[in-house]
Amino acid sequence: MNPGYRGRFAPSPTGPLHFGSLVGALASWLDARAHGGVWLVRIEDLDGPRTVPGAADDILATLAHFGMTPDEPPVWQSTRDAAYTAALERLVAAGLVYPCGCTRKEIADSLRAAHERHTTLAYPGTCRTGLHGKPARAWRLRVPDGCDAVITFDDRWQHTQSQNLATEVGDFVLKRADGQWAYQLAVVVDDADAGITHVVRGADLLDSTARQIYLQRCLGVPTPEYLHVPVVVDANGEKLSKQTGATALERNDPLPALQAAAAHLGLANDGDLPGGTLDAFYAAATDAWARRFGPRAG
């Protein structure tokens, strides 16, 4: 095993594992195996209202039925509050974050329109100079201006990516108004603490990557290599998800779903990879992955 490679799969326990999630799990697993590395699972259960009781255990059981067992015990984000608090305190001490009293409506009104390509509203910096009499609701990370705001990185699938944090995103939230930790802070702290060297995930998270790289720099932690795979969409062109009615995987017959996932990843035509046993499928799929993304020499 190559201790220099550490990858992970990070599902949210909002329901059972479905085909869209399987594609992400398979891609991250194949990349780890092709590199002879360690594959981890992190349960991203910070969003309490959306977390379904028992879903995390169900996801782990499904992964096991599909032949994907993490090399170390899974980590739950809900147990990581102290680590997130320590990271925020470091940023506060460095003067890189500030409290924000703006509501989403106030931000929308000040902008008149949100940038369509982002899941959060771009922030105009209203509270950068103070709360102006409003109560603190959230904590935001101050992004730089000018050329320093442009974050460029090479994605192993999507190639060179660039984003201007100042004009396209604005100062972004690290701790939400409801007291919950924002995804960007949690994932950066978790990846750093786990020693993650390679992140393989869906392209729906591509827009988050520049923010995460900037936050990594602020915290002085390494930046992993990134690979964003195409997401699975439904008949309406929407991302396949639990919210759009994605159904649970059939545990008792994993090979058809695995072959379809490999086909989605461009590794083979649907059904071309060997059936019969999981071992035969994974051996062929890992070789096919390594031919594109390396190295698996010998």
Swiss-Prot record:
Record motif 'KMSKS' region, residues: 239-243
Keyword Lyase in record: no
GO molecular function: ATP binding; glutamate-tRNA ligase activity; zinc ion binding
EC number: 6.1.1.-
Annotated positions binding ATP: 242
One GO BP: tRNA modification
GO CC annotations, alphabetized: cytosol
Domain of life: Bacteria
UniProt keyword list: Aminoacyl-tRNA synthetase, ATP-binding, Ligase, Metal-binding, Nucleotide-binding, Zinc
Residues reported to bind Zn(2+): 100, 102, 123, 127
Cofactor remark: Binds 1 zinc ion per subunit.
Family matches, as Pfam families: tRNA-synt_1c
Intervals of motif 'HIGH' region: 11-21
Keyword set includes tRNA-binding: no
Residues that coordinate or bind L-glutamate: 8-12, 44, 183, 201
Cofactor(s) the protein requires to work: Zn(2+)
Function: Catalyzes the tRNA-independent activation of glutamate in presence of ATP and the subsequent transfer of glutamate onto a tRNA(Asp). Glutamate is transferred on the 2-amino-5-(4,5-dihydroxy-2-cyclopenten-1-yl) moiety of the queuosine in the wobble position of the QUC anticodon.
Similarity comment: family membership: Belongs to the class-I aminoacyl-tRNA synthetase family. GluQ subfamily.
Protein name stated in the entry: Glutamyl-Q tRNA(Asp) synthetase
UniProt organism field: Burkholderia cenocepacia (strain HI2424)
Lineage, highest ranks first: Bacteria, Pseudomonadati, Pseudomonadota, Betaproteobacteria, Burkholderiales
